């Protein structure tokens, strides 16, 4: 018998909290982001899907917006993230993606929230930046912040499409932020989007 996702969410939430409490979290180069916040600006943290666990240890409880797959597994993730204070738009590249993007823009604009996006999710290809994060940052005039979650000790789920990384208890997690930048193009045609996705991928790889 399949257990409904909503019944699993509380246990997963408390498991995450207990696991997170064992980690030694270090945020690197957050000062440029703090200066943007001090000036009333918005940011979109852009990370790889396989490093999501480490990345949200630095951002939990910050009332951020994210986009989560419309799949059943996505329902579990959305439930846990919601309990952590995230606002989750449900969608993907193949289902409801445009609607989720519009919802995310509206909530970030109306509520003054920042965003966090797994740029190659929810199904890959691994470490290939998709278009959505570029459109999101451009529509909001928000700063993009390349973000890596680097763990000293981790379990790698080798059979997962993204080789998901789970930091082991007592591991040191370095959440490394690249320099924030804005998308300068006034309009986004496909060549401009392709340039921006390549630019972001290069910045992410350079961080680790």
PLM regions and their residue ranges:
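A cross-family acyltransferase "interaction/gating" segment
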Residues: 130-187
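Catalytic core of membrane glycerolipid acyltransferases/transacylases, capturing the structured
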Residues: 42-96, 157
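Short, charged beta->alpha transition segments
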Residues: 74-78, 100-108
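Short, hinge-like loop/turn segments at secondary-structure boundaries
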Residues: 82-85, 107-108, 161-168
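Generic beta-sheet signal
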Residues: 91, 118, 146-149
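Membrane-anchoring hydrophobic helices of lipid-metabolizing enzymes
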Residues: 1-62, 105, 168-170, 195-208
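Catalytic-site beta-strand/loop segments enriched in glycine and acidic/polar residues
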Residues: 104-136, 140
